UniProtKB/Swiss-Prot annotation:
The modification N6-(pyridoxal phosphate)lysine is found at residue 230. It comes from Thermobifida fusca (strain YX). Disulfide bonds: none annotated. This is Histidinol-phosphate aminotransferase. It is an enzyme of class 2 (transferase). Its cofactor is pyridoxal 5'-phosphate. The keyword Amino-acid biosynthesis applies. Pathway: Amino-acid biosynthesis; L-histidine biosynthesis; L-histidine from 5-phospho-alpha-D-ribose 1-diphosphate: step 7/9. Its EC number is 2.6.1.9. The gene is hisC. It catalyses: L-histidinol phosphate + 2-oxoglutarate = 3-(imidazol-4-yl)-2-oxopropyl phosphate + L-glutamate. GO terms for biological process: L-histidine biosynthetic process. Keywords: Amino-acid biosynthesis, Aminotransferase, Histidine biosynthesis, Pyridoxal phosphate, Transferase. Belongs to the class-II pyridoxal-phosphate-dependent aminotransferase family. Histidinol-phosphate aminotransferase subfamily. Homodimer.
Amino acid sequence: MSDFGHTGFSIDDLPLRDDLRGQAPYGAPQLTVKAVLNTNENPYPPSPELVEAIGRAAAEAAVGLNRYPDREATALRQALADYLGHGVDAANVWAANGSNEILQQILQAFGGPGHKALGFEPSYSMHPIIARGTATEWVSVPRTADFDVDADAAVAAVKEHEPSVVFLTSPNNPTGTALPLATVEAIAAAAPGVVVVDEAYAEFRREGTPSALSLLRTYPNVIVSRTMSKAFAMAGVRLGYLAAHPAVVDALQLVRLPYHLSTVTQAVALTALRYADELLSAVATLRAERDALVDWLRAHGFEVADSDANFVLFGRFPDRSAVFQHLLDQGVLIREVGPPEWLRVTVGTPEEMAIFREALLTATGRA
């Protein structure tokens, strides 16, 4: 890499914030291997028909690329509201470049110096990273041994720390655990600020597992965040969104950058929503593959967390890094994340899962 003639100049020579010194950026490996099962992507690409429709939409949008996009993303927000249901309207919806930008805007608006964000870990690793990036104090509360959130302990933690933002992830990443609505309600009733229910994997929930969308009318401090990266198989589009009281949307508009959602992004996302039935048709297949994987892992002596997502957390391994590397050596990329002794695998195609099963048995000496 070029040093532009300044030999020896490094990040340490920059006026970096003290709390960022020595930190590492987020990064999941991006490798070309037989089975990519590490970032919880939907393994099924869009159909040729949808690819063509997206191409047409992008071409139509390109005609006006000399102009800024719709700053409010009005049509997209209405389409997202229609998809969500639960009486949600465009005024209740906000969209951004991936759900991470949604979470960042929430912390920009409600966090910052002198404010706290509280989460129940192990959980989504970006929550504390985004908190740090917005100079929000992060408070970590441990989950139970089975990766649940104890409602009484959670309420006690909220009352003790008085956070401006509480993060609840349901289904939880990396464990796959979904929260009962009663737990969310108890925390929402106790919280002095907003409660963000991160539902990135909501479409993969098992039958009977509720969404916090049903709480929005009762609890105006509840925010439900979603994404089109998982069930919608649109990770490359970078489209996240939330549903909340209109006052929350008004607050986020104070911190959003102008014209933050490009014309092309809006056009592609709108097209994907018109093909929602087709895109979501793979969800049932992935659920069935997930449940079969859970049964297989348990039958082979592994400990497995119940999952309502498109991934499975399994263990336990005295040296999980060695198992991870053995799998990678066989062309299978999973994720070394979450509590020690555990690994996470994304649910892929039947062919990818067959490769994973064989590789795992070899890696653990059970072949």
